[in-house]
Regions:
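A short, well-structured juxtamembrane/interface segment
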Residues: 2-17
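Glycine-rich phosphate-binding loops that contact phosphosugars or nucleotide phosphates
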Residues: 21, 25-124
Length: 124
């Protein structure tokens, strides 16, 4: 069961946010894109995620995640990251940010996390 303090912190961050950036890598990027659309439709909050055009433009410059996160920090009140590994390269880039929620199979030590329990992670 999720810690109530963390659960309250996650809910508070979401309620306060006017704009939300979602990010993931691989299959989680597709989930982030779909989730951004659904979140906008159900909440009316401005939600966005990188798409293949962004990745093509940023990908040639090496680590696209850093560049995209810089962009997201400037345009979003909240960043939601989706990952299969709680200690992924993406997660390490988010550790020092206050406005982050993580979706992952396990809880992160410092980032408020919504734990996705499933046998096959991409089937939630």
């Amino acid at each position: 069961m999720m810690n109530l303090l963390i659960e309250g912190k996650i809910l508070s961050k979401f309620k306060k946010a006017r704009s939300i950036a979602l990010v993931g890598t691989g299959g989680n990027l597709a989930i982030a894109q779909h989730m951004a659309s659904d979140m906008y439709r159900h909440t009316g909050k401005f939600c966005f995620a990188p798409d293949s055009v962004n990745l093509t433009a940023l990908g040639g410059d090496g680590d696209w995640k850093s560049k995209w996160l810089d962009y997201a920090r400037g345009g979003a009140d909240l960043i939601i990251a989706i990952t299969c590994r709680v200690e992924s390269p993406l997660t390490r880039q988010l550790v020092n940010l206050d406005n982050v929620i993580l979706f992952a199979p396990d809880y992160h030590d410092t980032i408020p996390t919504i734990r996705i329990e499933s046998t096959y992670y991409h089937e939630f």
